[in-house]
Amino acid sequence: MLPSLALLLLAAWTVRALEVPTDGNAGLLAEPQIAMFCGKLNMHMNVQNGKWESDPSGTKTCIGTKEGILQYCQEVYPELQITNVVEANQPVTIQNWCKRGRKQCKTHTHIVIPYRCLVGEFVSDALLVPDKCKFLHQERMDVCETHLHWHTVAKETCSEKSTNLHDYGMLLPCGIDKFRGVEFVCCPLAEESDSIDSADAEEDDSDVWWGGADTDYADGGEDKVVEVAEEEEVADVEEEEAEDDEDVEDGDEVEEEAEEPYEEATERTTSIATTTTTTTESVEEVVREVCSEQAETGPCRAMISRWYFDVTEGKCAPFFYGGCGGNRNNFDTEEYCMAVCGSVSSQSLLKTTSEPLPQDPVKLPTTAASTPDAVDKYLETPGDENEHAHFQKAKERLEAKHRERMSQVMREWEEAERQAKNLPKADKKAVIQHFQEKVESLEQEAANERQQLVETHMARVEAMLNDRRRLALENYITALQAVPPRPHHVFNMLKKYVRAEQKDRQHTLKHFEHVRMVDPKKAAQIRSQVMTHLRVIYERMNQSLSLLYNVPAVAEEIQDEVDELLQKEQNYSDDVLANMISEPRISYGNDALMPSLTETKTTVELLPVNGEFSLDDLQPWHPFGVDSVPANTENEVEPVDARPAADRGLTTRPGSGLTNIKTEEISEVKMDAEFGHDSGFEVRHQKLVFFAEDVGSNKGAIIGLMVGGVVIATVIVITLVMLKKKQYTSIHHGVVEVDAAVTPEERHLSKMQQNGYENPTYKFFEQMQN
């Protein structure tokens, strides 16, 4: 009985220990996580059985943005309240990766860093603090950085204290995978090294491994590397053979694999650097890549005699190694160097090194050069109707390439820190500074590429919108010029033109919102241009609508439809203006080529500007009535200007008919010189307030109010003074007037009597008489 009870208690304790110790994941066997490997279907953790499963839809592959990762977490875990994501601290080995269109696969194994899907309110991780270790934390409320930044901060802090980073976790979330602090545990070097198994320490003794095969040829591991590479190659061959067998069984899948998109092949190729499998390189290619690298001393200043393979000479040559960083063309002895690189033909090495090699100690992934650059490919391809889809693909490839480069740099950083453990503190700081500069340069390069991508996309969208608007306006004018004009055809052309103008306005506002979020200073500079463009749209639409009055018969017949159209557009303008500040986050992938606002409900925000705002400035027209058109018995229509009175100086060629109308004349609108300086907009409390432009008409009322205010203030002051004076005069203490001719003794006696003094003699005689 007792052994059975002990087994039950042990099983219950084991299940309890497997549960994730977070409030949001209470009762779950595993923590919600997702993993991505470009070219393969995404994987997610089954929280009920703790196993990795493929994408349920069978279509989702690697995601390029943090917003997309959060959305995918919410899709695969609909029963959980996923509020944020964070990159995991440690990589995991996941099997059974599948390509698109396959539900079950085997022998596909990759090592990746997953993303944790955080449930409910954020709760910091519970870190274990071993003996002789210290728990530390850092918070900065003015900083909102990624998981990678805070990991670097924790490592630097522990390194300054001559300790190793044992574990860490994020604090104070401020965005998607962004935080304001970090908690971490630093352990002494001796304690950390004792707690790690010696076999594991030879492979990787750092706290975080960023994936990838960390091959060190300088440590005499040639046989191990070649053996591992051969095993991987055999596994890949078997994997491809198994897939070929499956393809033979299903002819449709053969066609699908043969017609695999170029983009998917590119993503699969560029993901090699983040895994431990060599899916496209043979052992010879790996060795050729190593032996073709130039000798790198590294950022440290040690003088260690090493050997490297010289491509031009075809033999190994000595050089001095600094002790950290560098590359893999680094061998202890000449014999070992020749054993690795001597078997590779010099012609293949010269072919590999025909292009200039980077001089930087941090070697970026070489697989990116095998495919065209994502941004360059997008920029070289002319725009078409699928501009938005091409832009989204280019953006995802750019983010994937940036993540790949950052992962490679972090692996190099880890390797350099392992090698620099026994070096002086100055050398350690030099290593940290070098890689910090490298990370910053990669971030800046990615930011420049993003900006170039966005600017090109915006320019193409604007050109396409201009073409659409021009074509719609020409069709509208042609319909008006038809003999006889068909009212319903005219209305359809007018509706298309209005939609084209609406797209232009939507594109302008979204572009300004993106610039405002990325670069507020630049947004302030282009603010007047944005307002001017909105004003141009307003003027252009008023002129186009005024043309309808030249054909009164058509205007009268379609008046109801036009009024309804104008009301819808006015409601659209009100919705846009009312929601300008309600949702400030807009990805730079949204643009005017996406579905209209009535379908997507995307909101924008305008910065407050100096000056006055008129609601009509963003409402492109005013409703009109055909009854206001005067009758003309001679069929000569006097056009009615539907624009505001202040803007009626623009000529519309009254009475000239529509035979000589040109689209360019409508598109070119004269703007007031003052509008560039005073944009005429003001936002208060998320509402738009109209101020009359003609302030002179209210000067009389203002002067009257000022005079009345002065009079009222004067009366109040006089009243207060009188009340104060009355208060002081009403207070008295029974003062009795004394004749000025009396003697000083009598005056003194009078004052004493006023204060209650009684002459004792008088009091004695009064008592005697009584």
Swiss-Prot record:
Indicate the segments forming the BPTI/Kunitz inhibitor domain, all copies: 291-341
Q: Where is this site: Cleavage?
A: 197-198, 219-220, 671-672, 678-679, 687-688, 690-691, 711-714, 720-721, 739-740
Q: Where is this region: CuBD subdomain?
A: 131-189
Which interval of the chain is the signal sequence? 1-17
Query: E1 domain location, by residue?
Result: 28-189
- Consequence of changing K763R: Loss of ubiquitination
Known consequence of changing Y757G?
No DBB1 binding
Q: What induces or represses expression of this protein, per its UniProt record? A: Phosphorylation of mature, glycosylated APP occurs 48-72 hours after treatment of neuronal cells with nerve growth factor which correlates with the timing of neurite outgrowth.
Listed disulfide bonds for this chain?
C38-C62, C73-C117, C98-C105, C133-C187, C144-C174, C158-C186, C291-C341, C300-C324, C316-C337
Q: Where is this site: Susceptible to oxidation?
A: M706
> Acidic residues composition bias: which ranges?
196-207, 228-264
Q: Which residues cross the membrane?
A: 702-722
Residues annotated as region Zinc-binding?
A: 181-188
Location of region: Disordered: 196-283
Positions binding Zn(2+) 1 in this chain are E183, C186, C187
Segments of this protein annotated with the region Copper-binding: 135-155
Q: Give the start-end ranges of region Required for the interaction with KIF5B and for anterograde transport in axons.
A: 756-770
Q: Where is this motif: Basolateral sorting signal?
A: 724-734
The record lists the effect of S656A as: No chondroitin sulfate linkage to isoform L-APP733
Q: Provide the membrane-side ranges marked Extracellular in the record.
A: 18-701
Residues reported in the UniProt entry to bind Cu(2+) 2: H677, H685
Q: Which residues are glycosylated?
A: N542, N571, S656
Residue positions where Phosphotyrosine is found in the record: Y497, Y757
Database matches in InterPro entries: Amyloid_Cu-bd_sf, Amyloid_glyco, Amyloid_glyco_Abeta, Amyloid_glyco_Cu-bd, Amyloid_glyco_E2_domain, Amyloid_glyco_extra, Amyloid_glyco_heparin-bd, Amyloid_glyco_heparin-bd_sf
Main function: Functions as a cell surface receptor and performs physiological functions on the surface of neurons relevant to neurite growth, neuronal adhesion and axonogenesis. Interaction between APP molecules on neighboring cells promotes synaptogenesis. Involved in cell mobility and transcription regulation through protein-protein interactions. Can promote transcription activation through binding to APBB1-KAT5 and inhibit Notch signaling through interaction with Numb. Couples to apoptosis-inducing pathways such as those mediated by G(o) and JIP. Inhibits G(o)-alpha ATPase activity. Amyloid-beta peptides are lipophilic metal chelators with metal-reducing activity. Binds transient metals such as copper, zinc and iron. Rat and mouse amyloid-beta peptides bind only weakly transient metals and have little reducing activity due to substitutions of transient metal chelating residues. Amyloid-beta protein 42 may activate mononuclear phagocytes in the brain and elicits inflammatory responses. Promotes both tau aggregation and TPK II-mediated phosphorylation. Also binds GPC1 in lipid rafts.
Annotated protein name in UniProt: Amyloid-beta precursor protein
